Amino acid sequence: MIDYTAAGFTLLQGAHLYAPEDRGICDVLVANGKIIAVASNIPSDIVPNCTVVDLSGQILCPGFIDQHVHLIGGGGEAGPTTRTPEVALSRLTEAGVTSVVGLLGTDSISRHPESLLAKTRALNEEGISAWMLTGAYHVPSRTITGSVEKDVAIIDRVIGVKCAISDHRSAAPDVYHLANMAAESRVGGLLGGKPGVTVFHMGDSKKALQPIYDLLENCDVPISKLLPTHVNRNVPLFEQALEFARKGGTIDITSSIDEPVAPAEGIARAVQAGIPLARVTLSSDGNGSQPFFDDEGNLTHIGVAGFETLLETVQVLVKDYDFSISDALRPLTSSVAGFLNLTGKGEILPGNDADLLVMTPELRIEQVYARGKLMVKDGKACVKGTFETA
């Protein structure tokens, strides 16, 4: 028999639901961190002691899934003082991020996969959903167990591996190292019931995606398990990325890169090229270092990349590129969940996790629920991380 009091039911009434598909005006019933029901009219007395939230005139959509975040900090390329700090929970939730994938960057000397794993687990305890990629720019990969395959297979939060290619900061890996790494991630994923993906940080080298094509020629890892990211950082790379997506690959556009290919422009161009939105994702590269230069190219100061560009990209897609709200949301919701095989994420459906955003008609975030818990109210975090000030 259900203990309705313990279940803590919440009924979200009257919002325009984008699940992300347009469902019109709907009610959503939530309990125990899950979506229990979605219908055009759910009576408020369907269960006793139900908290009713009137969302008339507002939009309800899935929480954002940001698959590229430097959870324990990034940077360091301009010396020790440019190492960015760990991310705070509220920076994620106030940007609408309810699920996150952490990773390392250039620095795998003073930062370690073990520390990233601890941070990932901490964020799960603080209320959102978090996973990680093992490895970093360096190849062979820095790992926890000594093996990419073991990390992915047996460590609960590890779902794949990351490396860098076509970048002066990479380890200049040859095709056989890349193929072995991707194959280990793939097999580890099979053994552990994980996606087993390989994420490639893309640099500005004119080689662009050629190392990935060489990998595909020399091993049998499916193209669907390989993800080039930062593909909008230069025009030739972006053009190659579109061709990669036409061949069946998925591409990741970085929201914090505003030129030469702005994120909304990149998504729009992909759609114009006939690429399904299911194979286009958007991520922030958040919490990494963000350098600023003067007119002579001198470094003036370094900030920390934020997450606001995710929502801004959605807004620009709707306002400037005539995207439906449904399609504008997909690269941050269902497309990411599909690529990473994140069961229960990315769609508002019965049985899925209650990761929900409440937005105004102008697409401003008002409330954020993560696994059914209210994390943001009136646009401000009402739940803070362990060491955040109230």
Swiss-Prot record:
Checking InterPro entries in the record gives:
Amidohydro-rel, Isoaspartyl-dipeptidase, Metal-dep_hydrolase_composite, Metal_Hydrolase, Metallo-dep_Hydrolases_sf, Pept_M38_dipep
| Binding positions for Zn(2+) 1 per the UniProt entry | 68, 70, 162, 285
As for subcellular location, the record says: Cytoplasm
Enzyme Commission number(s) of this protein: 3.4.19.-
Gene Ontology CC annotation, any one: cytoplasm
Q: Identify the residues that bind Zn(2+) 2.
A: 162, 201, 230
Q: Give the record's cofactor note, including how many are bound.
A: Binds 2 Zn(2+) ions per subunit. Has highest activity with Zn(2+) ions, but is also active with Co(2+) ions.
Please name the catalytic residues of this protein: 285
* Source species, domain of life: Bacteria
Q: How is its activity regulated?
A: P-hydroxymercuribenzoate causes a slight inhibition (8 to 17 %). Iodoacetamide, o-iodosobenzoate and ammonium persulfate do not inhibit the enzyme activity.
Q: What does this protein do?
A: Catalyzes the hydrolytic cleavage of a subset of L-isoaspartyl (L-beta-aspartyl) dipeptides. Used to degrade proteins damaged by L-isoaspartyl residues formation. The best substrate for the enzyme reported thus far is iso-Asp-Leu.
Tell me which family the UniProt entry assigns to this protein: Belongs to the peptidase M38 family.
Protein name in the entry: Isoaspartyl dipeptidase
Provide the species name.
Answer: Escherichia coli (strain K12)
Which gene specifies this protein's sequence? iadA
